Amino acid sequence: LNGHTAAVFINFEKKPTKEQLIEKLESFKGFPQEAELPSAPKQFIQYLSEDDRPQVKADVNYENGMGVSIGRLREDSMYDYKFIGLSHNTVRGAAGGAVLCAEALTAKGYIQAK
């Protein structure tokens, strides 16, 4: 199976509500989305509200493996929030990530065709 799962614990200077945090995650657009790079996922992050998601078998291929799935967002006693993140280690992490970097470098003018 492919898939990297991360348990993430976060603090904020000003703690947002859970709903505000979910909205920010779902609406995030980085340079790849703004530049509409060919390999970039349309929506980089998907939030899954089910208690048992994300799961590798069900969610690793989100946006053809180039997106990130986040779920199980909860308030935490030591941190503001905790959640589980999932990405595809081969597509997003290696091969697809390298292609996306090359597309970004080309879009920014660092790489030109001869």
Regions found by a protein language model. Give the residues of each.
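C-terminal substrate-binding/catalytic lobe of Rossmann-fold NAD(P)-dependent oxidoreductases
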Residues: 1-82
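Generic C-terminus detector
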Residues: 80-114
